[in-house]
Every structure is written in C-alpha cells, then in structure tokens.
Amino acid sequence: MAFRTKQDQVAEILRERIIAGTYPRGTKLKQSQIAEELGVSITPVREALHTLEAEGYVAGVSHKGLLVPEVVPGAATEVFELRVLLERELTARAVAAMTPRDIVGLRESQARIVALTGSGTEQDMRAENYRFHFRLYELANRPQTLQFVRVLWAKYPFIGQEYVGRREKQLAEHERFLALLEAGDAEGAVQALVDHIESGWAGMQAGGPTEVEAASEPRPKRRVIRA
C-alpha cells in the first residue's frame, strides 16, 4: 500500500464526508473544527482543503470561506456521461489487473454496506459505497483518470441525497458485478458496473430524492489520523 501523508488522509476523509452528505451542500468547512475532530494540526487540514478546492469538492466564497458547493444547473447530464466513459475505462483496467485478494477486499466492502443497511446511517452507507467504487478504480493504476473521476463525483447531484428504492437496488447491482467478477466474466463485470452507474442516474431522474432531515443527521465521527 502506498504511503499516505496526513494531508492525503484528511483529504480522503473530507471527500467521503462530502459524498456521504455529512457535510451537506452549502456547509461552511472550518479548519479548526476539522483539525480538532481528526486530531491533527491546522496545516494538513489547510493543505487538504486546497486539494479539495482544486477538485471541486469545496469552493471559496467571498466573505464566507470554503463551502461545499451547490450543483451547477444543467451540468448533471454531461457529468453523468463523462462518469460512464471514464469509470468504464477504469473498471476494465482494474478487472484486468485484479488478484483474488483484491476481489476479497471488494467483497469485504460490500459486506460492510450490507451490514449498514440495518444498523448504519445514510451517511455511513454512502461513504462505504464511495470506498467500494474507489477501491475498485484505484486498482486500474491510472492516477490521472482517477483524479478526473474524483472531480466528477464532486460535481454529481447525488451528493447528500437518497433516492427511493435505491438502497436495495445498489446492493443487488454490486452483487451482480461481484458475481460476474468471481465467475471470471471480465466483460460482463465491466458492463454490470456501467449498468450500475446508469441505473443510479435513471433512478435520480425518475424518482427524485427522498426527504433528508439535516437536523437529525449525526455529527461527523471522530477519526484519528495516523502519522
């Protein structure tokens, strides 16, 4: 496993929180609060936020500081099309390079998502879904493409939203992908992952988000950054 600096670790935790909706769109991110929650100094938090600003996960707003940005109207379709294009490529390369141990790792991530359906929050599930996808994409060993995909996830309108019936369907789609992977059907597995992305997009367009009560959402869990 590649060495990850404190800045890298903080950035990844913040990405997960934004994707999960722990920090809803419009939330102001305070460096001191994040540093205290993660048990680090201000410096890696500041550097991580600079990285996330470049990726589009946060945006600097005059007199307000760094906020989780709102969705750009009309951009969702283009973002979806780019996701399909790039994530298909990453998945194909990841599947070609995958070892049995990698498949076990994805299975473990899927098991955590399943466990969270009964005991976890929506934020927990969305964060674990993010880990599942990027655990897969990192196996492609295409860091520049991976970076573009991170940017696209930041711009996608699903951040912080849950769509009617999506939870069960997501689990079934992950399961289909894994089953094809374990059966040695590389082409089928890649198409299953693409179908999964397209299914999420179709559900978002057809069903719309269910109501999420921001006031009832738990505070971010304290995470400890390793030196």
Language model feature labels by segment:
Residues H63, L86, E108, K169-A172:
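Alpha-helix N-cap/N′ positions at the starts of helices
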